């Protein structure tokens, strides 16, 4: 039986590390499934940068941000250790812009569209997010929350 593959939205990764979040338990369990090689995890370079930004931000982390050194260590040990497949943006940048134009999307939506364009190329079993409304009008994307996978 082939393992399912899951392309992660950044919010799920953040919740996996934020023990105060109501989404922490399911997100952390899903992350553990990747680390234990039970499912195939896929992320983008963008996820790494967004995760760094959020984990070092005092307001996003409820006054308890991680230091740059702590985040560097976390990223290297968890996400850059070979457990996740990380895709670059080079092949999908034009497609991202084309989709945003076609769907008349603007501002911060471009970042969601960038992840979406990568899922079109790499075709994971699921795209996992707690922000399903951000992606619901996009074709060829099977959305799940961590709760629906675990």
Residue ranges and their predicted role:
Residues 54-86:
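Helix-adjacent hinge/juxtasegments
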Residues 83-130:
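Active-site neighborhoods of divalent-metal-dependent phosphate/nucleic-acid chemistry enzymes
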Residues 37-38, 81, 138:
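Structured helix-beta-strand junction loops
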Residues 1-5, 113-150:
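Acidic, PIN/NYN-like endoribonuclease modules and their adjacent C-terminal/linker elements
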Residues 42-45, 129:
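Short beta-strand segments at enzyme active-site cores
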Residues 10, 45, 109-113:
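Conserved glycosyltransferase catalytic-site signature
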Residues 1-43, 60-69, 150:
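Short, well-structured N-terminal submotif of metal-dependent ribonuclease cores
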